[in-house]
């Protein structure tokens, strides 16, 4: 049985409460990422900017794990406002133009009022 491996990024200080992602075999489980910029930590001004921030951060995490957005299998999205869904979908489509992963989108309250979106993904590392 493969051993669980923690994926860390060099650009951010490790969070003592969670890992950006874990690898198990050829699967990568990315923790929920929010609308903060992956380098500066600043929160995006609207749903479009926050969605881009999240997906760019996920892209970096997947690269550190040895895979890419092309290999995302599932996406779970939490939006704080249902009315943001159309704008979210437009930004999301830029990152997944074809071979879209299975996706669940729900409306939920997040841990900070300025955050509008949180995304969790599972990806694979191709053989």
Q: Which residue stretches match the model-derived regions?
A:
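N-terminal presequence-like segments and the immediate start of the first folded domain
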Residues: 1-56, 60-73, 79-127
């Amino acid at each position: 049985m493969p051993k669980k491996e923690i994926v860390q990024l060099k650009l951010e200080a490790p969070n003592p409460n969670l890992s950006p992602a874990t690898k198990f075999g050829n699967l990568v489980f990315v923790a929920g990422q929010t609308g903060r910029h992956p380098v500066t930590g600043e929160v995006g001004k609207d749903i479009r900017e926050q969605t881009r921030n999240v997906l760019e951060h996920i892209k970096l995490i997947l690269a550190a794990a040895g895979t890419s957005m092309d290999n995302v299998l599932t996406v779970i999205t939490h939006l704080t406002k249902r009315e943001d869904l159309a704008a979210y979908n437009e930004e999301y489509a830029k990152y997944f133009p074809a071979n879209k992963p299975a996706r669940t989108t729900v409306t939920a309250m997040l841990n900070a009022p300025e955050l509008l979106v949180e995304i969790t993904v599972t990806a694979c590392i191709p053989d």
